[in-house]
Amino acid sequence: MRVVYWVGTSWKMNKTLAEALDFAERLAGFIPGFDDRIQPFVIPPFTAVREVKRALSSTRIKVGAQNMHWADAGAWTGEISPPMLRDCGLDLVELGHSERREHFGETDRTVGLKTAAAVKHGMIPLICVGETLAERESGQADAVLSAQVEGALQFLEGEAKTAKILFAYEPVWAIGDKGIPASADYADKQQALIKTVAGALLPSVPPVLYGGSVNPGNAAELVGQPNIDGLFIGRSAWQADGYIDILGRASAAI
């Protein structure tokens, strides 16, 4: 039985500080009295995380970052450390997005190091996993997902394995402005696999969100699937009205 249903959005490389604060203020005015079965979260760009967190500090909305380094400090020019994110008051951090894997050399090992660092510093890792179209068509999807999940968890030891961890299943072929949403049945099947693999490595099965062209038209059907524990929304939620619309649809469908 679901205790909470996660519904959030990552803004990627979008929004000025003024735009981010406008979104946050709209959301802060909506959330009081909203369905407490749903846990909202937003993931702004680094330039806005502190201010957005402050703007939402009186609400239950969680705020995260889109990436971080695994080291606490050091000669890592251009990187952001876990203590820096905690200093901003952040609750979670998105790790392993396919764009970072493809364009910035992210690997299962570095995702694993970052996952362990996030847990160490009291943040929830939101670990993105997903197969490419070529991997799906060649029958490798299950093997790819299993390897990504195992890699993300490989450096967790002892009590760290009991920390709150989230996965987001984002098939690479389903994301972006040209993405084709996965069918609800297919997404549910792949998310069941992720839960099986993660559940064998952790004391409890972590929640798995679905991300990949989530929109007002498919949100309710996705929410109705037993293995989909939340929605991780892209461009359909980049405007406050769009995000609020999908929050309402998720609430009605639970």
From Swiss-Prot:
Homodimer. It is found in: Cytoplasm. Catalyzes the isomerization of D-erythrulose-4P to L-erythrulose-1P. Keywords: Cytoplasm, Gluconeogenesis, Glycolysis, Isomerase, Pentose shunt. It is an enzyme of class 5 (isomerase). It holds the Pfam family TIM. GO terms for biological process: gluconeogenesis; glyceraldehyde-3-phosphate biosynthetic process; glycerol catabolic process; glycolytic process; pentose-phosphate shunt. GO terms for cellular component: cytosol. GO terms for molecular function: triose-phosphate isomerase activity. Substrate binds at G176, S213. InterPro entries: Aldolase_TIM, TIM_sf, Triosephosphate_isomerase, Triosephosphate_isomerase_AS. It catalyses: L-erythrulose 1-phosphate = D-erythrulose 4-phosphate. It comes from Mesorhizobium japonicum (strain LMG 29417 / CECT 9101 / MAFF 303099) (Mesorhizobium loti (strain MAFF 303099)). The keyword Cell inner membrane does not apply. The active site is at H97 (electrophile), E170 (proton acceptor). PANTHER family: TRIOSEPHOSPHATE ISOMERASE (PTHR21139:SF42). Its main location: cytoplasm. Pathway: Carbohydrate metabolism; erythritol degradation. This is L-erythrulose-1-phosphate isomerase. Its EC number is 5.3.1.33. The keyword Kinase does not apply. Belongs to the triosephosphate isomerase family.
